[in-house]
Every structure is written in C-alpha cells, then in structure tokens.
Amino acid sequence: MSIPLYEVLILASILFAMGLACVVAWRANVIMMLIGIEIMLNAVMLTFVGGSAHWGIAEGQVFSLMIMALTSAEVSLALAMVAYLHRRKQSVDTDDFSSMKG
C-alpha cells in the first residue's frame, strides 16, 4: 500500500510552513533559526522521496542523501560558530554575529 502523492505534498507543505514560521518568528536566536532551516530541508527531502516513490525513479532518494550530507556539514559549521559566539559574548543572538571577524 502506497501513500498518495498529494498527501505527501500536503505534509511537506505543512512542514515547510512550520520551518518558515520558526525562522521568521525567532530571527534573533540562531539555534531556533537552525532548527527552522532543518525542518524546511526535511520537508524538501520528503517531497523528493515522495516523488521518487510515486514515479518509480531513484533520483529523489539520491537528492535526499545529498541534502542529508549538506545539512550535516551546515549544522556542524553553524554549531561551531554558535559555540564560539557563546563563549565570547555569552549570547546566541544574531546581532552578535556582526562582531565576529574573519
């Protein structure tokens, strides 16, 4: 039994909207922005996998693996910057990133 594509797209749209709302609502907090971006990328991965299953091709799953690799690199770099900023400023606000040099 397979889930219809429109249900996958509806779920992905809801996830993307939740991630976008998270990014827009908590623009001052870097960690919440990262969580919102991760939710949006998971919605994109769900769309790729759903389309891949619907049309019977493997490219969507390959793109999902590429997105997973991209997000792991993004999270590791972003969390390193957040840890550095927290050590220097005792804060994780986005306004404090303007003081970083490099």
Swiss-Prot record:
Topology relative to the membrane: Multi-pass membrane protein
Keywords for this protein: Cell inner membrane, Cell membrane, Membrane, NAD, Quinone, Translocase, Transmembrane, Transmembrane helix, Transport, Ubiquinone
Pfam families: Oxidored_q2
Keyword Transmembrane helix carried by entry: yes
Enzyme Commission no: 7.1.1.-
Record GO terms (molecular function): NADH:ubiquinone reductase (non-electrogenic) activity; quinone binding
Transmembrane segments: 5-25, 30-50, 62-82
Main location: membrane
Any single GO BP term: ATP synthesis coupled electron transport
Domain of life: Bacteria
InterPro entries on file: NADH_UbQ_OxRdtase_chain4L/K (IPR001133), NUOK/Mnh_C1-like (IPR039428)
UniProt entry tagged with the keyword Transport: yes
Gene Ontology CC: one annotated term: NADH dehydrogenase complex
Places the protein is found: Cell inner membrane
Catalytic activity: a quinone + NADH + 5 H(+)(in) = a quinol + NAD(+) + 4 H(+)(out)
Annotated family: Belongs to the complex I subunit 4L family.
Subunit structure: NDH-1 is composed of 14 different subunits. Subunits NuoA, H, J, K, L, M, N constitute the membrane sector of the complex.
Record function comment: NDH-1 shuttles electrons from NADH, via FMN and iron-sulfur (Fe-S) centers, to quinones in the respiratory chain. The immediate electron acceptor for the enzyme in this species is believed to be ubiquinone. Couples the redox reaction to proton translocation (for every two electrons transferred, four hydrogen ions are translocated across the cytoplasmic membrane), and thus conserves the redox energy in a proton gradient.
Identification of the protein by name: NADH-quinone oxidoreductase subunit K 1
Encoding gene (name): nuoK1
